[in-house]
Curated annotation (Swiss-Prot):
Name this protein carries in UniProt: Trypsin inhibitor 4
Family designation: Belongs to the protease inhibitor I7 (squash-type serine protease inhibitor) family.
Residues marked Reactive bond (site): 8-9
Cellular location(s): Secreted
Keyword Secreted on entry: yes
Claim: Oxidoreductase is one of the keywords in the record: no
InterPro entries linked to this entry: Prot_inh_squash (IPR000737), Proteinase_amylase_inhib_sf (IPR011052)
Originating species: Cucurbita maxima
Primary location class: secreted
Record-linked SMART domains: PTI (SM00286)
Function: Inhibits trypsin.
Disulphide bond pairs: 6-23, 13-25, 19-31
GO molecular function: serine-type endopeptidase inhibitor activity
Lineage: Eukaryota, Viridiplantae, Streptophyta, Embryophyta, Tracheophyta
Key words, A-Z: Disulfide bond, Knottin, Protease inhibitor, Secreted, Serine protease inhibitor
Amino acid sequence: HEERVCPRILMKCKKDSDCLAECVCLEHGYCG
């Protein structure tokens, strides 16, 4: 399967659009 492009940077978020590239906002409140 195609890997999502997600830089390994710890970023706080409230929604997916707060995150870089193809990262999504995870339940613990950080992008991943």
